[in-house]
Amino acid sequence: MKDNKIIIFDTTLRDGEQALGSSLGINQKLQIALALENLGVDVIEAGFPVSSQGDFKAVQKIASKVKNSTICALSRALDKDIDMAYEALKVAKHFRIHTFIATSTLHMQDKLKKDFDEILSMAKRAIIRARSYTDDVEFSCEDAGRTPIDNLCFMVENAIKAGAKTINIPDTVGYTLPSEFANIIKILFNKVPNIDKAIISVHCHNDLGMATGNSLSAILQGARQIECTINGLGERAGNCALEEVVMAIKTRKDYLKGFYTDIKCENIFKTSKLVSAITNESIPSHKAIVGSNAFSHSSGIHQDGVLKNRQTYEIISPSAIGIHENRMLMTARSGRAMIKTCLENLGYDENTYNLDDVYERFLRLADKKGQVYDYDLEALMFLSYESEEENEFVLEKLSVISGNIPTACVCMRIKEELKTEACTGNGPVEAVFNCIARITNLKPALKAYSINAKSSGVDAQGQVDVDLEFKGRKFHGKGLSTDVIEASAQAFVSAYNAIYRSLKVEERKMA
């Protein structure tokens, strides 16, 4: 194929949604679809209309709103499925019907109870029916990775003859390795006489962690469409991750010569975060490209290298996917160069402090606290702050009443004085936040709030992380407890103490 554009077919709303504990609402699906359109996705598989009335309506609404991406709906090789897909899609500016049937011996015999000739006949009939509605028909050979190669070649040849313009080769259970999968695509191009009449697509699952590798190996052998999902969302171990294949193609142009996509890479990160928020599926911190640690550096050796030249330890610029903040973490593994750079960024001349002394105290704080923030470093310099035990605000007691009007009562120690306040809120967490704000007489804005389980069982501990914004600066707080409300209160108090120390630093600077 002369054109080396790789078509990006996103199935977050269909295959990705199957991984969720509950279905997404119509407006949630539309929000994701519009984000995918803005990202530059070529084909959006919006759902499986015959599966439920809700899915039908979601596909129909997406089809009516999205204008720049082709909207696709899935159907089995059955007339009612294909007809329903068309009814949902017909309002779209551009639409595709995607029909499929299993072709592996295992699936044909044990699941469908049919022989290969029957499956072949069903496939051709389905494609012809779909073609009566649109020229844009995709056919998938389900479990192609475990289908005998001669059967697969014959099926693909006949599917193209029947009118399919895109032939999808799925590794449905993530069984193949990149060299195997590449060989399947290579054989298809060598043995199927009419293969130039269709676009070959691949749909790889990640059961053995090979989804991205398999997809990339396939395009080297002639495939020109990759089916994928945002954040690799999907059944079992997930699907090929859109962000991974797109950035691999963009980053490794030396190896993947001439290949490109129309994805607006600068929108990748915000799309990833949006999908994570809507689906309530957190992104693992170590997830390639979009994980919180993907561009973070805590090792002193790595930090020193990045400070001298980012390419020493970063093969992708964070800004390429829309991240514009520095993720150099200050921990006990950080070196003097990192601390010096942080102080320079805060406006301190190296002649105004003793780096060895500051670094020694920094290490003591980092050993106790874990991650150290820039405001902690300032407090360490001006206030000799080296321990969380030196906090101005201490949480003493907490009680919460849930119901129609959630109410919290918080008692805090400020120096030697105990102060108690009771407040209401939209929920118990907000009520606690309001109490702490009133007691401290500080009014920061809550910018981020997250809960993560740190253990399992009925006595599981939850960690709450919060980001508060005060006078244009963000402050982080962390709390850990078997009670999520108590953990929230601890996190708020931790952040409030950081704010208080920053105010004391400003006083010292002015003195």
From Swiss-Prot:
Keywords: Amino-acid biosynthesis, Branched-chain amino acid biosynthesis, Cytoplasm, Leucine biosynthesis, Manganese, Metal-binding, Transferase. Residues 6-269 form the Pyruvate carboxyltransferase domain. InterPro entries: 2-IPM_HCS-like (IPR050073), 2-isopropylmalate_synth_dimer (IPR013709), AIPM/Hcit_synth_CS (IPR002034), Aldolase_TIM (IPR013785), LeuA/HCS_post-cat (IPR054691), LeuA_allosteric_dom_sf (IPR036230), LeuA_bact_synth (IPR005671), PYR_CT (IPR000891). Residues 394-511 are annotated as: Regulatory domain. GO terms for biological process: L-leucine biosynthetic process. GO terms for cellular component: cytosol. Homodimer. HAMAP family: LeuA_type1. Belongs to the alpha-IPM synthase/homocitrate synthase family. LeuA type 1 subfamily. Catalyzes the condensation of the acetyl group of acetyl-CoA with 3-methyl-2-oxobutanoate (2-ketoisovalerate) to form 3-carboxy-3-hydroxy-4-methylpentanoate (2-isopropylmalate). This is 2-isopropylmalate synthase. It comes from Campylobacter jejuni subsp. jejuni serotype O:2 (strain ATCC 700819 / NCTC 11168). The gene is leuA.
